[in-house]
């Protein structure tokens, strides 16, 4: 996944991919931009496509996911590329179970049927018992502590493979809840254990008053983690240290599977919807960060 314009990193990863394939037929470029005008995506796609064609002597398969009638759609159709559409009503941060998330994950070898089953189960379980569901409990827990001035919400993942999920969590909460007219602003933070224990955790323990934390432990499906016992001890130690500082904490355990991760992500989206409804904030409108594109 190429997600930022960094020349050295992009060059290194791209040439690593090229050296690992026998022909261009093993490569597909999946370009995602709802507006079709995102500068980073456009530059990356052009650079990757031209580099592959130059070295492997043939254009790679290109798959485009974009909004209808965008410039990207028009250029893709003219080039006979494969095109998937993202509906106008679906915002980027809520698009993980649309073509935006499912197509690249399928290309990457993930089981998207299990992803959809996990997401669907979260919705079905909430509909059956909305007042006692984990989604409702988390939303009310956050609202309660917001009223006490705790507005820094940290999701601390004790699993290095969860770093990208953590970034998605931050974007989801920041763009959905971080609005000018929201007096109960919640500042989302993601950290990864054990790396961030001596950085973010230090700040949390030292300045405990604004924080509330969800401690997440991702459990491998196969019990072959040689460091599991040590990581479990560090997880529980870090959690207990936060409790000793009177920081409100939640514990969450997730199996490292498509089903469980999708279920957790869908629950987070539902939490945001409940929070936004309670605080009368529009979670779906365009965030102010889009201003940079016109500057």
Residues covered by each model-derived region:
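Acidic catalytic cores of enzymes that act on phosphate-bearing nucleotides/polynucleotides
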Residues: 1, 13-14, 110-114, 124-253
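C-terminal amphipathic alpha-helical interaction region
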Residues: 282-295
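A generic structural motif
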Residues: 32-38, 90, 104-110, 160-161, ...
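Active-site regions of enzymes building and remodeling cell-envelope glycoconjugates
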Residues: 78-83, 245-248, 258
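Short glycine/proline-rich, acidic loop/turn segments that cap or connect secondary-structure elements
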Residues: 260-274
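Glycine-rich phosphate-binding loops that contact phosphosugars or nucleotide phosphates
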Residues: 1-129
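A short acidic, often aromatic-flanked loop/helix-cap motif at beta-alpha or helix-coil junctions
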Residues: 9-12, 89-95, 194-198, 256-262
């Amino acid at each position: 996944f190429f997600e930022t314009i960094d020349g050295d990193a992009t060059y290194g990863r791209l040439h690593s991919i090229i050296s690992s394939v026998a022909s261009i037929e093993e490569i597909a470029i999946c370009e995602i931009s709802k507006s079709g005008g995102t500068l980073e995506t456009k530059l990356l796609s052009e650079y990757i496509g031209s580099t592959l064609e130059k070295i492997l002597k043939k254009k790679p398969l290109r798959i485009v996911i974009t909004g209808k009638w965008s410039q990207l759609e028009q250029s893709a159709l003219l080039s006979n590329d494969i095109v998937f559409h993202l509906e106008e009503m679906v915002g980027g941060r809520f698009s993980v179970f649309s073509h935006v998330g499912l197509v690249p994950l399928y290309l990457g070898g993930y089981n998207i049927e299990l992803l959809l089953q996990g997401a669907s189960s979260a919705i079905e379980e909430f509909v059956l018992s909305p007042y006692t569901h984990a989604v409702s409990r988390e939303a009310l827990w956050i609202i309660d502590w917001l009223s006490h001035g705790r507005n820094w919400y940290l999701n601390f993942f004790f699993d290095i493979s969860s770093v990208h999920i953590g970034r998605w969590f931050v974007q989801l909460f920041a763009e959905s809840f971080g609005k000018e007219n929201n007096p109960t602003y919640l500042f989302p933070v993601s950290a990864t254990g054990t790396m961030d224990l001596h950085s973010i955790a230090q700040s949390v323990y030292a300045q405990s008053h604004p924080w509330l934390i969800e401690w997440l432990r991702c459990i491998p499906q196969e019990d072959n983690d040689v460091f599991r016992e040590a990581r479990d001890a560090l997880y529980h130690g870090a959690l207990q240290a936060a409790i000793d500082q009177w920081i409100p904490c939640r514990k969450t355990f997730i199996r490292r599977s498509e089903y469980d991760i999708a279920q957790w992500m869908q629950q987070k989206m539902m939490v945001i919807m409940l929070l936004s409804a309670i605080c009368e904030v529009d979670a779906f409108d365009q965030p102010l960060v889009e201003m940079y594109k016109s500057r």
